[in-house]
Regions:
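A residue-level marker of the well-folded mature domains of exported/periplasmic proteins
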Residues: 1-361
Length: 361
C-alpha cells in the first residue's frame, strides 16, 4: 500500500479489561496523529467506542464487535469474516477422512463421532462448530459431534485436557477446535487421532494427524479501511469478508493423513459453490432443531413439522435478547449485510451434544 514504517503504529499486549485499550486508542489518536485505528480483541470494544466518541475525525475499527450498528457513531465500525465458510469447507475434509476410516474398517458409520474443543458457549464458537459439523455431515451423513468448552480463548493445558477427554471418554475419532493454542493438536498427535485446526496450519505440531486448517485473513479489510480513509470515503459500519474476497483462507491439505488429490478437488468444488451463492452453509433443509423453551434450549427458534428452522429471533443488537428474524429464502443468514458482521448463530442443532457449557464470567 506504499505506507512507510513511520505511518504504521502497532501497540501490543493490550488487555481486554481495564482502561488500557482506551488509553492506547487516545494516545494513537491524540499524540501519534493516527487517522484510522484498529483493535483486534472482543473485549476492546467498549473502550474503543468511548475513544471514537471523543475523536470524531479519526476512524475506529473493531474486529469481532457487535455495537457499531446500534451505537450510531459514524466513525466507529465493526468487522468480521465469514469464517463459517472456511469451517464448513474444513468440515468437508473431516467428513472425507471419516469416510476413509469407515471404508478401511477402522470405525463403523455409527462411530463417526467428532470431538470439538470450544472456548466459550458463545455465538462465535457455536456458529463455527456448527458450520464445521454441517460440512462433515454433508459427506458423512452418520457423523455426530460432542463439544467440551474450556472457558478460555487460550489455555494449552485445558485445551489438551479437553481434547484428551473427548478422545478417551467420549470416544471421538476426529478432533477440531475453536481455541487458540496447540493443546488440541498436541493431544491428537499423541493419541494418533486426526485433527482439523483453526487460525493457521498446525502441521509442524502434528505431522501425522493434521488434515487442514481455516483462518481469517485481515489483509483485505486493512486495505479497505486505509484506502477509504485516504480517499475520504466512508468505511462500512459492518463489514464481512468472505472466501470470495480472500478474507477466509485454508491451509494446504496434509496428503499423508487424507487422500490429497480427491480431497482438494472436493474442497475446491465446495468453494466454487460458496462463491457462486449456490451453497448456503446454514441451509435449513440440512439440519434439524429441537426446541425446548422450558429448558431454554433454542427458545428463539420456530420450526416446522420436520424440525426444520422457519424463524429465528437473533440477538443482533448485543443485549442478549432476540430481536430480529434472520431466516429467509430457506437459510439462516449468518453475518448478513443488513444485520451485523459478528456471528449470531447460537442454535444447538440436532447431532451436536454439549458435554459441558461455559459462558465465562
Amino acid at each position: 500500500m506504499g505506507l512507510s514504517d513511520e505511518q504504521v503504529v502497532i501497540v501490543t499486549n493490550i488487555p481486554e479489561t481495564g482502561s488500557d485499550c482506551y488509553d492506547a486508542a487516545v494516545d494513537l489518536a491524540k499524540n501519534k496523529k493516527c487517522n484510522v485505528i484498529f483493535a483486534d480483541s472482543f473485549g476492546h470494544e467498549s473502550n474503543l467506542l468511548k475513544a471514537a466518541k471523543e475523536y470524531p475525525d479519526v476512524q475506529f475499527c473493531h474486529a469481532t464487535g457487535t455495537s457499531a450498528k446500534t451505537a450510531g457513531v459514524k466513525n466507529f465500525h465493526n468487522a468480521f469474516a465469514a469464517i463459517y465458510e472456511g469451517r464448513y469447507v474444513a468440515g468437508v475434509a473431516a467428513g472425507i477422512k471419516l469416510n476413509e476410516m469407515i471404508k478401511e474398517g477402522k470405525i463403523t458409520a455409527d462411530q463417526a463421532v467428532i470431538g470439538y474443543v470450544g472456548a466459550f458457549t458463545y455465538a462465535e464458537v457455536i456458529s463455527g462448530m456448527t458450520s464445521f459439523y454441517l460440512g462433515a455431515k454433508s459427506v458423512c451423513p452418520s457423523a455426530t459431534m460432542k463439544v467440551r468448552y474450556t472457558g478460555s480463548w487460550y489455555d494449552q493445558a485445558l485445551e489438551q485436557e479437553a481434547a484428551t477427554s473427548l478422545i478417551e471418554q467420549d470416544k471421538c475419532v476426529l478432533i477440531s477446535q475453536h481455541a487458540d493454542s496447540l493443546g488440541a493438536p498436541t493431544a491428537c498427535e499423541l493419541k494418533g487421532v486426526p485433527n482439523v485446526s483453526y487460525n493457521g496450519s498446525t502441521y509442524e505440531a502434528g505431522k501425522n494427524t493434521f488434515i487442514v486448517s481455516s483462518a481469517i485473513n485481515w489483509a483485505p479489510y486493512f486495505q479497505l479501511i486505509i484506502e477509504n480513509t485516504v480517499k475520504g470515503e466512508e468505511i462500512p459500519t459492518n463489514w464481512v469478508g468472505t472466501i470470495a474476497t480472500n478474507s477466509v483462507v485454508l491451509s494446504g491439505v496434509n496428503q499423508d493423513v487424507v487422500d490429497g488429490e480427491s480431497t482438494v478437488a472436493e474442497l475446491n468444488k465446495v468453494i466454487d459453490q460458496l462463491n457462486a451463492g449456490t451453497l448456503h452453509v446454514f441451509d435449513v433443509n440440512n439440519f434439524t432443531v429441537t426446541v425446548d423453551a422450558k429448558n431454554k434450549l433454542n427458545a428463539n427458534a420456530k420450526v416446522d413439522e420436520n424440525k426444520h428452522l422457519t424463524e429465528y429471533m437473533a440477538d443482533i443488537d448485543g443485549d442478549y435478547v432476540g430481536d430480529t428474524n434472520v431466516v429467509h429464502d430457506g437459510y439462516f443468514d449468518e453475518s448478513g449485510d443488513s444485520f451485523r458482521s459478528a456471528p449470531y448463530f447460537d442454535i444447538i442443532i440436532d447431532g451436536i451434544t454439549n458435554i459441558n457449557t461455559n459462558y465465562g464470567g
